[in-house]
Amino acid sequence: MSRICVCGAFRLWDVPKGGQEVKTCILTDALEAKYGKIYRVDTLAKNSRFLMPFQLVWAMMTCKDIIILPAHNGLVVLSKFLTLLNTIFDRRLHYSVIGGWLQDLLPEHPDVIKALHKFTSIYVETQTMMDALQKLGFTNVCVVPNCKPLSILKRGQMPKMYTEPYKLVTFSRVTEKKGIGTAADLVMKLN
């Protein structure tokens, strides 16, 4: 029996493709390495809308900790559904936020705010988001920076190519909100 359930976008039938799927898999793999078998609920699975309520009831019956990593609509549904189930099962509910959109969604959904206040913890990627959620009255928020397992290169292994024009490489979606304009301006000034 698993101690922990992770409910998120696994894409169990294929290789994870987007940031949400990658983070869900990285988190689950890390938890599994430390705590053993994890019960996975794949929000992308075929028939997931039908199966997921039953899977989550099973998770509430058998797991002590339930971690969710939903997108926008999934959060609205899952937060309220799990909070309702938790009145019966009294489990530790956790929400690992992916991206920076949560503080924009919550003011439009006071019912989700109410549900998330009942979660044991909410893990956000930045201090800015933590501050925004604290302004909404949350005290169960902590910062867990985004991560990805990478091999550490030894000194001398990294190729040194410092020739103009300098190249810009990013590890995120290219959007103005993420500061790509500032980064591009700096590289253009250097070149």
Predicted features by range, described:
Residues 30, 43-89, 108-110:
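An amphipathic, basic-hydrophobic alpha-helix
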Residues 65-67, 121, 167:
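Structural motif
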Residues 71-75, 91-108, 121:
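A short, histidine- and acid-enriched strand-loop-helix "catalytic/donor-clamping" loop
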Residues 128, 147:
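Carbohydrate-associated surface elements
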